[in-house]
């Protein structure tokens, strides 16, 4: 049987009070509509169609290559939105699942179970339902004695007996595709909103003698729709718990999982420990047996095995096996730390490679440089790479020693086994085995204390 998924993503989302199109707000690193598309992909459908309206180009950019698109010119209700996909679907055999782009918590497992229930039951329409702890505000599912769905009753229209029902409509449906589009053409807009409701299709199908059923999913929280910032925060919290629990099942330890903020695409190896107040975002990959301490932030970075990150920030950076950094250091884009290297506290590295077993201990800036292996960079060293117009590169060879307080003014090449004396300002190349000293000689003034006007001040004696 052919399977199709239609995702409704044309609403304005005015309650978000945002310039950003509603379904493009992110939950754990992905836009809401991407989460829904990913769940849809998990059903292996023959076609995914996203119905767009407001912000159509932005949604198309995000979902390029993942979905076909239909355009809803005016937002005239959910029924009208699905009908916008008729040119792509109307005459096809199979089953169509309809979901909304502002429900990021649905899983592929739930969508697969809905397809399965729909097919096995021989329904023309199957409603995805859930038992709500507090069903107020939701449409209630009213069934007959055989469990078939008679109707969906909205809060404002229900009798006391109907409103006592705790099974609610999640807004996701599965239909026989051809019957869906036949019924949609019969849906009217004689209601207070003047809109065409997808739920009216159920009554049309039932009156035509078609079977309408339901699949009750076990986890009500999946059905959370995001219409404002409060719901966005709730969805993020639920998604974050789901992500962290999955990592824990795979052997990752969280000291405080409630304060570890991990995006959905992050990969973490087993035996890694993550403390509280840690943020890991984007396409970051972290190896096994690492330790990430509190207040660390890692974005789009690749971390090897046996790495320790102490209260530091990494962005588009790479740390190979058996390296460490921090506290309070910053790896900026294109920083590469090779195996066994040590980056200490208050170090900033940008677009630079630190070779194997090299040490950059503290209070140092390294930018636009390539450092070899077994190098020691002294405290307070600055790689001066910018002349106000262009950036320039510095090379430091293997087994070199850079003394404390040095300033390396690019472009220069410091050869293998060479030395730079403390507090030197280096503007020329340094040859192999040489030591560069570029500072004024020390001069001592004998008995200078007694020549100062303040020398007789008792506080100075």
Swiss-Prot record:
Disulfide bonds: none annotated. Binds 1 Mg(2+) ion per subunit. Its main location: cytoplasm. Pfam families: Hexapep, NTP_transferase. It catalyses: alpha-D-glucosamine 1-phosphate + acetyl-CoA = N-acetyl-alpha-D-glucosamine 1-phosphate + CoA + H(+); N-acetyl-alpha-D-glucosamine 1-phosphate + UTP + H(+) = UDP-N-acetyl-alpha-D-glucosamine + diphosphate. Acetyl-CoA binds at residues 385-386, 422, 439. Residues 230-250 are annotated as: Linker. InterPro entries: Bifunctional_GlmU (IPR005882), GlmU-like (IPR050065), GlmU_C_LbH (IPR038009), Hexapep (IPR001451), Hexapep_transf_CS (IPR018357), NTP_transferase_dom (IPR005835), Nucleotide-diphossugar_trans (IPR029044), Trimer_LpxA-like_sf (IPR011004). Mg(2+) binds at residues 102, 227. Its cofactor is Mg(2+). Its EC number is 2.7.7.23, 2.3.1.157. It comes from the Bacteria. The active site is at 362 (proton acceptor). Residues 251-461 are annotated as: N-acetyltransferase. GO terms for cellular component: cytoplasm; membrane. It is an enzyme of class 2 (transferase). It is found in: Cytoplasm. UDP-N-acetyl-alpha-D-glucosamine binds at residues 8-11, 22, 72, 77-78, 139, 154, 169, 227, 332, 350, 365, 376. Pathway: Nucleotide-sugar biosynthesis; UDP-N-acetyl-alpha-D-glucosamine biosynthesis; N-acetyl-alpha-D-glucosamine 1-phosphate from alpha-D-glucosamine 6-phosphate (route II): step 2/2; Nucleotide-sugar biosynthesis; UDP-N-acetyl-alpha-D-glucosamine biosynthesis; UDP-N-acetyl-alpha-D-glucosamine from N-acetyl-alpha-D-glucosamine 1-phosphate: step 1/1; Bacterial outer membrane biogenesis; LPS lipid A biosynthesis. PANTHER family: BIFUNCTIONAL PROTEIN GLMU (PTHR43584:SF3), NUCLEOTIDYL TRANSFERASE (PTHR43584). In the N-terminal section; belongs to the N-acetylglucosamine-1-phosphate uridyltransferase family. Homotrimer. Catalyzes the last two sequential reactions in the de novo biosynthetic pathway for UDP-N-acetylglucosamine (UDP-GlcNAc). The C-terminal domain catalyzes the transfer of acetyl group from acetyl coenzyme A to glucosamine-1-phosphate (GlcN-1-P) to produce N-acetylglucosamine-1-phosphate (GlcNAc-1-P), which is converted into UDP-GlcNAc by the transfer of uridine 5-monophosphate (from uridine 5-triphosphate), a reaction catalyzed by the N-terminal domain. NCBIfam families: glmU, PRK14354.1. This is Bifunctional protein GlmU. It comes from Lactobacillus gasseri (strain ATCC 33323 / DSM 20243 / BCRC 14619 / CIP 102991 / JCM 1131 / KCTC 3163 / NCIMB 11718 / NCTC 13722 / AM63). The lineage of its organism: Bacteria, Bacillati, Bacillota, Bacilli, Lactobacillales.
């Amino acid at each position: 049987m052919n399977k199709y998924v239609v995702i409704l993503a044309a609403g304005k989302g005015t309650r978000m009070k945002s310039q950003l199109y509603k379904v493009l707000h992110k939950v754990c690193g992905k836009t809401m509509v991407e989460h829904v598309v990913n769940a849809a992909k998990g059903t292996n459908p023959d076609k995914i169609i996203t119905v767009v309206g407001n912000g159509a180009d932005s949604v198309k950019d995000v979902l390029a290559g993942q979905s076909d698109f239909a355009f809803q010119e005016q937002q005239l209700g959910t029924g009208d939105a699905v009908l916008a996909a008729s040119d792509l679907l109307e005459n096809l055999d199979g089953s169509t699942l309809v979901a909304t782009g502002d429900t990021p918590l649905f899983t592929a497992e739930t969508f697969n179970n809905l397809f399965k229930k729909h097919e096995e039951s021989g329904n023309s329409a199957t409603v995805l339902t859930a038992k709500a702890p507090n069903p107020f505000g939701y449409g209630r599912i009213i069934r007959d004695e055989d469990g078939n769905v008679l109707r969906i009753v909205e809060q404002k229209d229900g009798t006391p007996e109907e409103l006592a029902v705790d099974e609610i409509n999640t807004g996701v449906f599965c239909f026989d595709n051809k019957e869906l589009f036949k019924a949609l053409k019969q849906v009217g807009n004689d209601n207070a909103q003047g809109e065409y409701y997808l739920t009216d299709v159920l009554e049309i199908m039932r009156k035509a003698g078609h079977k309408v059923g339901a699949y009750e999913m076990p986890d009500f929280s999946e059905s959370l729709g995001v219409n404002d910032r409060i719901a966005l925060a709730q969805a993020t919290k639920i998604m974050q718990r789901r992500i962290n629990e999955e990592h824990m099942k795979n052997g990752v330890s969280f000291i405080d999982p409630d304060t570890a903020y991990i995006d959905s695409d992050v990969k973490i190896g087993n035996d890694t420990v993550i403390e509280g107040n840690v943020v890991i975002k984007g396409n970051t990959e972290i190896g096994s047996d690492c330790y990430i301490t509190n207040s660390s932030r890692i974005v789009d970075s690749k971390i090897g095995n046996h790495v320790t990150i102490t209260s530091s920030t990494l962005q588009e950076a790479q740390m190979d096996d058996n390296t460490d950094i921090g506290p309070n250091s910053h790896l900026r884009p294109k920083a590469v730390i090779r195996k066994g290297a040590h980056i200490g506290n208050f170090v900033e590295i940008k677009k630079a490679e630190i070779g194997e077993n090299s040490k950059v201990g503290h209070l140092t800036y390294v930018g636009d440089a390539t450092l070899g292996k077994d190098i020691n960079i002294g405290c307070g060293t600055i790689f001066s790479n910018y002349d106000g117009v262009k950036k320039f590169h510095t090379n430091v060879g293997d087994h070199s020693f850079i003394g404390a307080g040095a300033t390396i003014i690019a472009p220069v090449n410091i050869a293998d086994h060479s030395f730079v004396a403390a507090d030197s300002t280096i503007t020329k190349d340094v040859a192999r085995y040489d030591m560069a000293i570029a500072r004024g000689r020390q001069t001592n003034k004998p008995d200078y204390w007694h020549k100062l006007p303040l020398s007789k001040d008792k506080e100075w004696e």
